[in-house]
């Protein structure tokens, strides 16, 4: 577990909001839903 920078945190929130259709623990990559392997 590393320290999340302010920018990374904001980016993550934007990704989550942009991909609300994705399930929890998933990330949006190029408009596609992918399981988040980084935790």
UniProtKB/Swiss-Prot annotation:
It is found in: Secreted. It comes from the Eukaryota. It comes from Californiconus californicus. Coiled coil: none annotated. Contains 2 disulfide bonds. The lineage of its organism: Eukaryota, Metazoa, Spiralia, Lophotrochozoa, Mollusca. GO terms for molecular function: toxin activity. Residues 1-15 form a propeptide. GO terms for cellular component: extracellular region. This is Conotoxin Cl14.7. The cysteine framework is XIV (C-C-C-C). Keywords: Disulfide bond, Neurotoxin, Secreted, Toxin. Expressed by the venom duct.
């Amino acid at each position: 577990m590393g320290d999340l920078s302010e920018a990374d945190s904001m980016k993550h929130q934007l990704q989550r909001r942009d991909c609300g259709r994705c399930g929890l623990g998933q990330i949006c990559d190029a408009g596609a839903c992918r399981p988040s392997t980084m935790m």
